[in-house]
Amino acid sequence: MAIVKCKPTSPGRRFVVKVVNQELHKGAPHAPLLEKKSKTGGRNNNGRITTRHIGGGHKQHYRLVDFRRNDKDGITATVERIEYDPNRTAHIALLLYADGERRYIIAPKGVSAGDQLIAGALAPIKPGNALQLRNIPVGSTVHGIELKPGKGAQIARSAGASAQLIAREGVYVTLRLRSGEMRKVLSECRATLGEVSNSEHSLRSLGKAGAKRWRGVRPTVRGVAMNPVDHPHGGGEGRTSGGRHPVSPWGFPTKGAKTRGNKRTDKMIVRRRK
C-alpha cells in the first residue's frame, strides 16, 4: 500500500490523502455473493428520522461475508483476489475452496492472491487461518473473534483491528483488545490469526465535504447554532458556549459520559478499557 498526497489542482483536491493498494481487484465483484441494499435515509416505516446524518450516497450492493468459517473445516481455500468493500473499512478476500464453492472473508493483513488458507483444529498457525481459541498459542494476534460459539465473528473486524491472546485458564481465554480492555472469551469460540487488512485506512483524508456525501453521510449541525426549540444548547444573544455541560439534542450527557449498561457480561471483563 502507498499513501498518496494529491497536488492542489483545485480546492477540493488540496487536502486529499489517498491510500492506494495495487493488489485490489479492479473488476466487478462476484455476483452470486451480492445482495440488494436499500437506502433508508435514516427514516423508519413512519418516515420519521431515527438516525441523523444519513442520506444520499452512491448506490451499493451488500457483499455476503462468511464470519463463521465453521462448515469448511479441513478444506483448503485459495485466495482468488482481494477486493474493496463499500460496506466496511477492511478489504475482503474472495476464496475458492477445493470443493468449488466461493466465499468472501475479511481480508487479513499480509494475505494476497494465490495464498492457501484453511480453517479447523488442524490448521497451521499462519495469518488467515481460522481456529478455535483453545488451539491458538498464547501471545498470538487474532481478529474476527466470536463471543458465542458458532455465532460468527463480532470483535476486531474493522480495518487494522486485532486482539492479543494473553492467557488460557479452564474453559476461557483472556484477550487484550486494542482499547486496552482485557476480556474473557470461551475457548470454544473461533478466531482468525493475524490482524485485519487496510491498517492505513485511518491515515486517509477525504479532502472535501462532497466526498462524505458520496458515502451517504449528511452534515452535522452544532447544537449552539440551533434555536432553543431544537437543542438544549440553542439560542442566546450572539455566540454562546451553550451554557451547560455538553448534552445530546435529547438532554443526555455526551462527550465522554459512560453509556455501557450490559451488566450481564460485566463478569467477562477482567479490566475495563482505558
UniProtKB/Swiss-Prot annotation:
PROSITE patterns: RIBOSOMAL_L2. One of its GO terms (biological process) is cytoplasmic translation. Keywords: Ribonucleoprotein, Ribosomal protein, RNA-binding, rRNA-binding. GO terms for molecular function: rRNA binding; structural constituent of ribosome; transferase activity. It holds the Pfam family Ribosomal_L2. Residues 263-274 have a biased composition (Basic and acidic residues). One of its GO terms (cellular component) is large ribosomal subunit. Residues 28-54, 224-274 are annotated as: Disordered. The keyword Ribonucleoprotein applies. One of the primary rRNA binding proteins. Required for association of the 30S and 50S subunits to form the 70S ribosome, for tRNA binding and peptide bond formation. It has been suggested to have peptidyltransferase activity; this is somewhat controversial. Makes several contacts with the 16S rRNA in the 70S ribosome. Part of the 50S ribosomal subunit. Forms a bridge to the 30S subunit in the 70S ribosome. Belongs to the universal ribosomal protein uL2 family. This is Large ribosomal subunit protein uL2.
